[in-house]
């Protein structure tokens, strides 16, 4: 049996990296679109709780602006589960979740949402740096 010093480090394959990036993009880039697609949801008012539930469900399922990004987001979850089967859990989870934030911020900015300036960019830089360190730790 090999000792830990004699084991060959597992390299991260391109499939793993691309899958994690795809998941982060599918989750992160759809968040601002889901938010936009649900505009008007909070103004719905009904006389009963059941009536309120019906109004909310009907509102959401009849808006393609909400449903399309939601479906893409959920397909990202399927890609995530498939990625977990092939990659290391301690690499996939933090990288996908942290990069989701980055892609959410980028997409929101591209859609014209106002952001708090340097704090967002500082946070994105730290997230990317942490993701790189996490990936390098798994490769070395």
UniProtKB/Swiss-Prot annotation:
* Gene3D superfamilies (UniProt xref): 1.10.3730.20
**Top-level taxon:** Eukaryota
Report the membrane topology from the UniProt record.
Multi-pass membrane protein
Would I find Iron among this entry's keywords?
Answer: no
What InterPro entries does the entry give? TMEM234 (IPR018908)
Q: Does the keyword Nucleotide-binding apply?
A: no
Alphabetized, the UniProt keywords read: Membrane, Transmembrane, Transmembrane helix
Localization per record: Membrane
**Regions that span the bilayer:** 14-34, 64-84, 88-108, 116-136
Q: Identify the GO cellular component terms for this protein.
A: membrane
UniProt family annotation: Belongs to the TMEM234 family.
Name of this protein? Transmembrane protein 234 homolog
